[in-house]
């Protein structure tokens, strides 16, 4: 068997998420159909991050195996041709032949996410579905201060979905930075792995700080409560991007 890695960009808006789901259209299904169309083989691909419905990717990574050897450029171009023909909002940025022990999910050393908040009075037109529109002016400096209280190895029970299937709520958050760029607030989060809904839960809590309703101490207290009920409202999916996966 020949193993291939693909780097993927997609608009999460039209999809029920990355993972294949019965009766719903997923990014995984779209790519698997494209692989079958050009190779004649039915495969199951494994992705580095199982993004939710509406979440985008600039640098998702996946792998799959084919019985026949193919040139990497041919794999990329053939997949893109079939994805385009099918009207999918998915682009294969790169394809590469890799060792058989490479695993897009379990070989990953770090995952990097970006959350975009469009912080302006006027609603979004061109960027609708690409960012969270928040009309009220947010204090990015206060949000960043609170974010630093959440960095490190912690029990993140407060910031994970009740549907999260991870065996342990303990994760090491390597980076959580908040910066303002004009009318946009960018929140960058990095870790080896994340809990389900962790980034969006963190963003929702930081927004409460930015509005002045919470302080950095309140955000830290929410973390220490280890109680989902202590979390701020979960941020919507359209502002979240899987930017890069490190190996």
Curated annotation (Swiss-Prot):
Formation of pseudouridine at positions 38, 39 and 40 in the anticodon stem and loop of transfer RNAs. The active site is at residue 52. It comes from Chelativorans sp. (strain BNC1). Homodimer. NCBIfam families: hisT_truA. One of its GO terms (biological process) is tRNA pseudouridine synthesis. Substrate binds at residue 113. Coiled coil: none annotated. The keyword Isomerase applies. It is an enzyme of class 5 (isomerase). Keywords: Isomerase, tRNA processing. The gene is truA. Its EC number is 5.4.99.12. HAMAP family: TruA (MF_00171). Belongs to the tRNA pseudouridine synthase TruA family. This is tRNA pseudouridine synthase A. The keyword Magnesium does not apply. It catalyses: uridine(38/39/40) in tRNA = pseudouridine(38/39/40) in tRNA. One of its GO terms (molecular function) is tRNA pseudouridine(38-40) synthase activity. InterPro entries: PsdUridine_synth_cat_dom_sf (IPR020103), PsdUridine_synth_TruA (IPR001406), PsdUridine_synth_TruA_a/b_dom (IPR020097), PsdUridine_synth_TruA_C (IPR020095), TruA/RsuA/RluB/E/F_N (IPR020094). It holds the Pfam family PseudoU_synth_1. It comes from the Bacteria.
């Amino acid at each position: 068997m020949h193993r291939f890695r693909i780097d993927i960009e997609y608009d999460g808006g039209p999809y029920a998420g990355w993972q294949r789901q019965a009766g719903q259209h997923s990014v995984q299904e779209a790519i698997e159909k494209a692989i079958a169309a050009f190779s004649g083989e039915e495969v199951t691909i494994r992705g580095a991050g199982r993004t939710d419905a509406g979440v985008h990717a600039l640098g998702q990574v996946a792998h799959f195996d084919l019985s026949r050897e193919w040139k990497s450029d041919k794999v990329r171009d053939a997949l893109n041709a079939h994805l385009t023909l099918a009207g999918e909002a998915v682009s294969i940025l790169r394809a590469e032949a890799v060792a058989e022990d490479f695993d897009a999910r379990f070989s990953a050393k770090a995952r990097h996410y970006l959350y975009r908040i469009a912080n302006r009075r006027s609603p979004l037109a061109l960027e609708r579905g690409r960012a969270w529109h928040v009309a009220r002016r947010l204090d990015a400096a206060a949000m960043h201060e609170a974010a630093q209280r959440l960095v490190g190895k912690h029990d993140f029970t407060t910031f994970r979905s009740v549907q999260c299937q991870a065996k342990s709520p303990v994760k090491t958050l390597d980076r959580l930075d908040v910066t303002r760029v004009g009318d946009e607030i960018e929140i960058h989060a990095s870790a080896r792995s994340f809990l389900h809904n962790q980034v969006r839960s963190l963003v929702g809590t930081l927004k409460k700080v930015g509005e002045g309703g919470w302080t950095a101490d309140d955000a830290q207290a929410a973390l220490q409560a280890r109680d989902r009920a202590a979390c701020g409202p979960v941020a919507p999916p359209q502002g979240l991007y899987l930017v890069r996966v490190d190996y």
